[in-house]
């Protein structure tokens, strides 16, 4: 019997077939993730792989909702396998944030599930490092989370010649949209189009943008301008002071597809352009408010009325693209069976 499409078997080295994945490489990646996260003061958490369907339909966005592994369980509850970890974390924080000193810095390595078209760097399940900070609104937190991302990739042997962090602003895009379109309900659709500009046929993008009242030329001109906002300048100054200026550039071509982002957003790419994004994240300051009962207010483009309102940001780094990148660059160590203890037995009576 064959395994399901888009899922993986992990074998210890040596691998019996090219169509399976290395359990040893997975352990190496997980150990490196944990080591650097602990160095930055992050603590590990976990949550259930099955959640109420509403947790994802609430604010993740239509694209993810269309990729859910969801069903009605024996208790007649609508549930879903988790496609991402951030809503679970926001739910957990909203429930018990008073028990923890701020800022809260947590990480997790969940297995995630999305029913989507298989392609290079994308399967129907993957493991992902999630690192998040709750309770810190200043740009220093944005800089810290990006530094963590950079140092993790450096720990695998990658340098500024191998990858770059493309930094953008969902807030800047929100202002761009609101000045040209009076209907805030179309914002997420617009963000989805921009998110796919680099991967989609230009003629298709032009038609989609025109349907919303935008021209392809004005959108690409905004991307090309590359003028950092004040909040992006503060992040760049912080990263430069830490010696990480060579790893980051402002690029408004990044917008992030998920609906809940509110401020600075970023993605890590290999400079050769051989792979999809290695990692991505940003600010999602409204999510705990929304999950704790808040409602979106189109007039202010914010969420109001929730029981908990905590500034939040973080990123995710999947194991699929990272493993493929490390393989291509020859940065995965050799794995072979080894004994921790060698016992020699000698018969002294002979």
Enumerate the language-model features and the residues they cover.
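Compositionally biased, intrinsically disordered low-complexity regions enriched in proline and serine
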Residues: 41-46, 70, 189-192, 217, ...
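Short alpha-helix boundary/capping motifs
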Residues: 61-66, 159, 177, 181
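Short terminal or interdomain "cap/linker" segment that borders an active site or interface and mediates
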Residues: 167-206
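Short, low-complexity, intrinsically disordered N-terminal segments
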Residues: 16-20, 188, 208
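Intrinsic-disorder-associated interaction segments
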Residues: 3, 18-22, 183, 198, ...
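Positively charged, Gly/Ser-enriched RNA/tRNA-binding surfaces
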Residues: 23-40, 51-54, 76, 86-100, ...
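TRNA-binding/sensing appendages of the translation machinery
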Residues: 1-87, 95, 143, 164-166
């Amino acid at each position: 019997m064959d395994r399901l499409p888009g899922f993986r078997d992990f074998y210890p080295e040596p691998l019996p077939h090219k169509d399976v994945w290395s359990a040893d490489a997975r352990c190496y990646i997980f150990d490196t993730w944990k080591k650097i996260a602990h160095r930055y003061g992050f603590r590990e958490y976990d949550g259930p792989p099955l959640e109420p369907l509403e947790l994802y339909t609430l604010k993740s966005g239509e694209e993810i909702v269309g990729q859910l592994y969801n069903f009605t369980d024996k208790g007649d509850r609508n549930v879903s396998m988790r496609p991402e970890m951030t809503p679970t974390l926001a739910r957990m924080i909203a429930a018990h944030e008073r028990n923890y000193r701020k800022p809260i810095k947590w990480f997790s390595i969940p297995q995630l599930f999305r029913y989507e078209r298989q392609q290079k760097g994308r399967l129907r399940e993957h493991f992902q490092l999630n690192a998040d900070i709750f309770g810190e609104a200043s740009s220093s937190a944005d800089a810290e989370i990006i530094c963590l991302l950079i140092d993790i990739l450096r720990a695998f042997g990658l340098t500024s010649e191998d990858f770059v962090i493309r930094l953008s602003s969902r807030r800047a895009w929100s202002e761009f949209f609101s000045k040209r379109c009076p209907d805030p309900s179309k914002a997420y659709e617009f963000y989805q189009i921009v998110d796919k500009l680099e991967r989609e046929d230009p003629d298709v993008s032009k038609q989609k943008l025109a349907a919303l009242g935008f021209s392809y030329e004005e959108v690409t001109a905004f991307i090309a301008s590359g003028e950092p906002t004040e909040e992006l300048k503060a992040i760049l100054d912080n990263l430069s002071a830490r010696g990480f200026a060579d790893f980051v550039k402002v690029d408004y071509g990044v917008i992030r597809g998920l609906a809940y982002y509110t401020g600075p957003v970023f993605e890590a790419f290999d400079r050769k352009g051989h792979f999809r994004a290695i990692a991505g994240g940003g600010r999602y300051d409204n999510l705990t408010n929304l999950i704790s009962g808040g409602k979106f207010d189109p007039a202010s483009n914010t969420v109001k009325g929730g029981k908990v309102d905590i500034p939040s940001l973080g990123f995710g780094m999947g194991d699929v693209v990272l493993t493929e990148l490390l393989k291509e660059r020859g940065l995965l160590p050799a794995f072979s069976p080894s004994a921790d203890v060698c016992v020699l037995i000698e018969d002294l009576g002979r």
